[in-house]
Structure formats: structure tokens, C-alpha cells
Swiss-Prot record:
Organism: Echis carinatus sochureki (Saw-scaled viper)
Protein name: Snaclec 3
Cysteine disulfide links: 27-38, 55-144, 121-136
PANTHER family (alphabetical): MANNOSE, PHOSPHOLIPASE, LECTIN RECEPTOR RELATED
Function: Interferes with one step of hemostasis (modulation of platelet aggregation, or coagulation cascade, for example).
Source taxonomy: Eukaryota, Metazoa, Chordata, Craniata, Vertebrata
Key words, A-Z: Disulfide bond, Hemostasis impairing toxin, Secreted, Signal, Toxin
Tissues in which the protein is found: Expressed by the venom gland.
Residues of the C-type lectin domain: 34-145
One Pfam family it belongs to: Lectin_C
């Protein structure tokens, strides 16, 4: 079921209360809901900075995806990334200023880690379900995340 808002730019889709992890989460049209957040995968290949900028322009509060537990990571892999040809996506975790001060672009606390070491931006290798540091200038697909 969905919201019948009259504004095309305010199209929202609310998940049925019977749909488990998506129950009661209202997201922009084309986005998927999980645990009070909305997610959307984009196949466009962009460097990290351009992908983050693109995400911030999609919806208020939207950034490159941040992951806070294995259940959320599994949701992204199974529900979102399955639409992408490449199993590698940008994540919002970075240290672009080389200060050893890792943080999510959405301001969330770094409370879950699954990475290999090197470079200043992170990709999520979905087939292996782990994160890898990589050069921020490379190009990858990405997932945007926004509060519902």
C-alpha cells in the first residue's frame, strides 16, 4: 500500500505491516525500507566523493550507506545489492582527511566493523560480506541510505 500524495516529488511507498523487516517503514518510491531507514542501489559508477554528493541530493538526510550490524548488512546484500551487476559498492565510511578519524558520512557512530586495512574510503564486497579500504578515486556502484 502507499501514500497517495499529490506531489510527484513527494511520492512515498509504505510497506505492508506483514512484510517483516520492512513493516511500517515509509520510503520514497523505488527505495526499500529496513529498521526505520530507506535504501536504494545505483548502478552508476562514480568515485567516492561524487557518489556521496549524489546520495545527499536524492533525499533529505541521505548519504552513502552506513552499516551497523550483520542483519543490516544482510538486508543490503539480499534486498538491495542483488539488482547490481557488480558485487562491490561504496560505503559512507571514510577518512578522506587522513586523520585516522574514521566515521560515517551520515554522522552515525562507528559501532560495527568488518574491514581489511589500507586507503581512506571503503567498499563493501557483498559476495564476501566484508569491507575493504580502497582509493577514493576508483569508481564503483553504490547504495544510498536515508532515514525513513
Amino acid at each position: 500500500w502507499g501514500d497517495s500524495s499529490s506531489s510527484a516529488s513527494a511520492c512515498w511507498s509504505c510497506s505492508s505491516p506483514l512484510s517483516g523487516t520492512e513493516a511500517g517503514v515509509c520510503c520514497p518510491l523505488g527505495w526499500s525500507g529496513y529498521d526505520q531507514n530507506c535504501y536504494k542501489a545505483f548502478e552508476e559508477l562514480m568515485n567516492w566523493a561524487d557518489a556521496e554528493k549524489f546520495c545527499t541530493q536524492q533525499h533529505k538526510g541521505s548519504h552513502l550507506v552506513s552499516l551497523h550490524n550483520i542483519a543490516e548488512a544482510d538486508f543490503v546484500v539480499k534486498k538491495i545489492v542483488s539488482v547490481l551487476k557488480d558485487g562491490v559498492i561504496w560505503m559512507g565510511l571514510n577518512d578522506v582527511w587522513n586523520e585516522c578519524n574514521w566515521g560515517w558520512t551520515d554522522g552515525a557512530q562507528l559501532d560495527y566493523k568488518a574491514w581489511n586495512v589500507e586507503s581512506n574510503c571503503f567498499i563493501f564486497k557483498t559476495a564476501e560480506n566484508h569491507w575493504s579500504r580502497t582509493d577514493c578515486s576508483g569508481t564503483h556502484s553504490f547504495v544510498c541510505k536515508s532515514p525513513a
